[in-house]
UniProtKB/Swiss-Prot annotation:
Subcellular location: Virion membrane
Keyword Transferase: no
Family: Belongs to the asfivirus EP84R family.
Protein name, as recorded: Transmembrane protein EP84R
GO cellular component, one term: virion membrane
Main location class: virion
Induction: Expressed in the late phase of the viral replicative cycle.
Keyword terms of this UniProt record: Late protein, Membrane, Transmembrane, Transmembrane helix, Virion
Residues annotated as transmembrane: 31-51, 59-79
Amino acid sequence: MPYSRDITKFITATEPEVGLPLLALQRSKSVIGIILLVISLLLIFIGIIILSVSSHTTAGSVLVVLSLILGGGGFFLIYKDNS
């Protein structure tokens, strides 16, 4: 039965129809994770500026908390790919 193989054989497969899509999926997860981290760092920076400059402390703190959650998701995607 060709579909009862171990998952490690799919990951290390040299067949283009099996190996390349998995490799592309793994790279895209890493790229998405890095993009999420960069966006979250920018949002944290903007949130800190909002907190320090203006009187919109609620909006700034919500922005910082949401960006920390977003960055945690990006870090999780990168960490999961590397483990």
